[in-house]
Amino acid sequence: MPDKTEYLLAINCGSSSIKGKLFAIPSFELLANLAVTNISSADERVKIRITWEEGKGKNSEEEADYGDKIRYASLVPILLDHLTNSTHVEKEEIKYVCHRVVHGGTHDRGIRVVKGHEEGLIEMDKLSEFAPLHNHRAVLAVKSCLDALPHHTSLLLFDTIFHQTIAPEVYTYALPPSDNELSMPLRKYGFHGLSYASIVRSLAEHLKKPSDQVNVVVAHLGSGSSSCCIKNGKSVDTSMGLTPLEGLLGGTRSGTIDPTAIFHHTKDAASDANVGDFTVSKAEIILNKNSGLKALAGTTNFGHIIQNLDPSKCSKEDHEKAKLTYAVFLDRLLNFVAQYLFKLLSEVPIESIDGLVFSGGIGEKGAELRRDVLKKLAWLGAEVDEEANNSNSGGTVKCITKEGSKLKGWVVETDEEGWMATMAKEEFGF
């Protein structure tokens, strides 16, 4: 009688979506992609989609209630039901589930959690104040997984792990001792680490070199944006800090501003405000949810901002807003990219720098932004290949600079779920 098939599920819980991938054990074969979208939306219904690799199962896509009507904790069980109903996979056969958790503090490896031994979840929930839009929801997802799959082992994998190689002089904040009881030190931690790790692997494979020889600057640009300086495959600096708020502006995040600005902007900035079932300051709500592209352009959709750069496509007011927003975004991005390229160039010759990578939704789709960034880097020998840059094809890794360009430009698709699965494979030894 053949051995019973077992599975690994990688789950990536965001504030507006859940993504996942299902792998066979021990072959590590990718079987299916999972997605839940429109979470928390008052205007659109939640969509649950299961897409199987050819011959592995029956694809399915269904709509549920409106996003703001569905409890977040119920979404993972709903997703599991759709998964098991679309093929022969049984819930009892899902042996491991790995979860993306944004903030892991100083942890340099994942944490295992099983039903009845959930101490790690308590620790992670304490860090929710530092990543209020992500950590708490990830904890809810893990708890719902433990209830739906009581036999399995969950592995919590943190975006902050990749940045544990950052030196003290880079991560230290010049603050006096705190009079608060802190759940972790106040310092730079950095985020998007699972994405950066997957990009290093993909670029190394494309260049046919070991990951520990990759020297690159990455711009992960999406609803949340950050940049990272990577030397010998390891993070040496990154734009996000104690929380994802520091650094580049995002869809609704302000990015780095003078810390006193919020107290002039809002009189009761330090007062409490509720986010679901926990409390943060009003300042954190304004800076995390009401700022960024939304504040400057009135939209979080970067594609709409690009469209409104054409004055014939919108009102004069929207055109002026789009021009300023785009200029601000480009300026802040160049500040970090140039800084990180300088860091690399101060230690390795330009011939040993693998280039500048664009990733994330904006990075992968924003041909105009990529061109404008690379043109500003012409002094380093960057030469844009217009045809490659404007093309929508090219695979996981695509070069967008000319053959003789001294500084290479790349578009690399990120694969957080795939990297999580790799980490789980190493952790569990299958």
UniProtKB/Swiss-Prot annotation:
The active site annotation covers 159 (proton donor/acceptor)
Homology family: Belongs to the acetokinase family.
The protein's Enzyme Commission number: 2.7.2.1
Question: Molecular function (GO) terms listed?
Answer: acetate kinase activity; ATP binding; magnesium ion binding
UniProt keyword annotations, A-Z:
ATP-binding, Kinase, Magnesium, Metal-binding, Nucleotide-binding, Transferase
Where exactly is the site Transition state stabilizer?
192, 253
One matching Pfam family: Acetate_kinase
Cofactor(s) recorded for this entry are: Mg(2+)
Kindly provide the name given to this protein in its UniProt entry. Answer: Probable acetate kinase
InterPro entries registered for this protein in UniProt: Ac/propionate_kinase, Aliphatic_acid_kin_short-chain, Aliphatic_acid_kinase_CS, ATPase_NBD
Write out the pathway annotation from the protein's UniProt entry: Metabolic intermediate biosynthesis; acetyl-CoA biosynthesis; acetyl-CoA from acetate: step 1/2
Where along this sequence does the record place binding of substrate? Answer: 100
Swiss-Prot/TrEMBL GO biological process terms: acetate metabolic process; acetyl-CoA biosynthetic process
Organism the protein comes from: Cryptococcus neoformans var. neoformans serotype D (strain JEC21 / ATCC MYA-565) (Filobasidiella neoformans)
